[in-house]
Structure formats: structure tokens, C-alpha cells
């Protein structure tokens, strides 16, 4: 719809939106670094009258507080905050703007208090902002609150998705959680912004009208999610910190300053790793994987490639430069992605040229000689044991800064996963020269 402006967070596979009216804007589910929303508002010289949240997010920090710091916006949420500046999205909630009406529709399932927002004109629903309820190719996952509530939330999700069947086929659906989001349960790639008609054709969970089958398919699709999920709740309920108050990491070549810190090697070359560092290549899921192994209270230092440090400009973190400059500043993008998930204690940024690199022990299809691998893929994949899946190992490190002794004592010193990223990450934590990981294909394809 022309009225709706879409923004994407590639790192988290999430969407957020602006509804653009003639005189004002309404923002929906913005992330902590809400610069694109604020810049769009400045560009149009239109105020942001409301910030609507479909749910208290588990996977990222809200940008509502950054927006409220600049605009006199009304913050609309589905449950009470610790702040005084909010309005509840209850059964009486409605915004009337220039002939349009926005109302809330209770759609529990992803969370107990989840709501969707309906954009209407003259009583006709034009679009639904579905948050973590119905997504383009599935529904929002129902296991994030607590395992004991998964069954109840799944039942709620079934009833909530059925409410969407009451809308006309032409109604657009704008989900917050996109394809690849850990908050979603999906079946196959589909357009990001479907209509009700396309959902009825292509979204298997949306189509399913038998609850038992729906529940079985949803639960069986629930994979692992990063350890930091849930740690965002206090912030999103009002214990927030503006990005401008975060201590900015210092760029240094002094390798002694990061003693005692956890060191992250963010360089992208799979064939090398920084000595005594955890190897997490700086790709589109970097913040998620850091959040899988690093508690947000843990001080860290990050090694970046020299060329990226050359392009680093602190002003980009605070939205004090042109948006085009941020696009070429990979480190600022990475830091904002980390801030978005609550990882703030980044003390130092270190050039790759100033640290010692080790050649990683990897096996490719060309060098494979029949070694026995220990597969650390998720427990629902055929060759893995749940107790030593990547998720279990990473969560143990997240809590204890160490791996389970039972795992470290395994005779198999060869780790594998689908792409090599998770195996390389765990291998780098072990920091054992004998540990070899598969870095370019799964074990199955070697035979």
C-alpha cells in the first residue's frame, strides 16, 4: 500500500513500519536504533504522533524510547510499562486520522498480550499489522515465554490466526517477524507482505483448520533460538537506556588492554582465527550468534578487519551523519545490531593487523580422509545428540563462560554442522589445536 513505508532489519530478519498520513506519521514496532524512522520523519517534516507496539519483544529492544526522546509521541503498548508515558492497546483503543482509523485486535499466541493493529477506512479493513501473530509463511513461535506456557499459547495462536480468516482476501498483512527470524515458525519462503488471499493459498499453518494437526506442525517446527531472548523484556517494559548514553568502544592496537575480556574474532576469513578468540564472522546473523554465547553483562572486545576500522565513524552510531555514510560503515552497523539486542559492553575495537592469527584446522571435501565427526547441528537433525547440540553448548557457555566437561572429554575431536559457522564457533571456544571443524559443506556431502 502506498500509505505504508516498510523498513527492514536484516540482522534480525524483522520488519517495522510507518503509516504516512498528510500531516503526521505512525510508527509500528521500531527497533532500538530507530534512525530510519526519525530520518524519514525529518525528511518529510512530519511529526510521529504514535508509536504502536504489537507485543513486548523477546528478540530486540524497542526504538520507542529513542523516538519519544525527540517527538511528543503517544506510546501504545499491549501491557503496562514501568514508565508513565504510554497508552494501553485495549478494546477501546482507536486512532482517527484524516478519515482513517487504527484499532487494536487481541491476537495472543506469540505472547499472552499480543495485539495486531487494523488500518481501516470507512469501516473497511485495508491492512493488518500482525506482529508475531500471522507471518508471511507461518505464525509466530509460541515457546518464548516459558515451556510450561507453550501449549496454552499454541492454542491461543490457533484461535488468533483464525480471526484473520474473517478479513477480505484483498487485505494486506504486514508482519513484524520476517523470513529467517528466530521468532517465526515457517514452512517455505513467500512474499514478505502477503494478502489474506495468498495466505489462504501458501501458508500451511494459516490454512490448517484442525487444531491437533496445527499444534503438531507448529511444535515440530520450533528450532533453537539465541540465548539472549527474554533478556530484552525489562528494557522494553521501561528500564531503558538511550544509545547516546552507551559507552562507545575505543579503537586500540594495544593487545594487553583486552586481557580478562572475552575476545570476538569478527573477521570473515574462515581459514584463520585470532588466537584465544571466539570466531564469529561478521555476517548478517553476527549479533544473533554473539547473543547466543555472550551474556549482555559480559565485557567483550571485537577484532575487525583493518579496512572496516578505516570506515568507522562514531557519529554514525548517534544518527549525526548522513544515512549514506552509515551504509558504508560496517562497524557502526554491527555495533547498532549488537545494541539492538542489548549487547552494550563492547570495550575495545581491535584491528586485525595488530593481533596474532592462527590457521584454523578445517576439512573440506578435497581434504576429507574419512575422519569421524561429531555433528553439533540442532537436535531435530538426524546426526546430532540433543545434549551436545550447538544450542545446548552455546547456552552453557552463555551462563558459565565454559563448555560442559563431558563435551570437552569426548574422544571425537572433529566437529561439523551445515555451513561450518556453528562448528567453527564451538571449535574456537575449545581452542584446541587438535579440534578440526568442517567449514564448507555438511558431513553428508563428503561421502
Question: Each predicted region: which residue ranges?
Answer:
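Active-site neighborhood of phospho(di)ester-bond hydrolases with catalytic His/Asp-centered motifs
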Residues: 27-29, 47-57, 75-79, 106-109, ...
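Active-site-proximal cofactor/substrate-binding loop regions of enzyme domains
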Residues: 38, 66, 75-77, 82-117, ...
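Active-site metal-binding motif and surrounding structural segment of the metallo-beta-lactamase
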Residues: 32-77
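Conserved beta-strand hairpin/beta-sheet module of binuclear metal-dependent hydrolase folds
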Residues: 1-47, 117-131, 137
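Divalent-metal (often Zn2+) His-rich catalytic cores of metallo-beta-lactamase-fold enzymes
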Residues: 155-245
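Rhodanese-like catalytic fold shared by cysteine-dependent sulfurtransferases
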Residues: 90-92, 141-143, 198-230, 268-447
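Core dinuclear metal-dependent hydrolase active-site scaffold
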Residues: 2-4, 17-20, 94-123, 166, ...
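Active-site metal-binding loops of divalent metal-dependent hydrolases
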Residues: 30-31, 56, 110-111, 131-134, ...
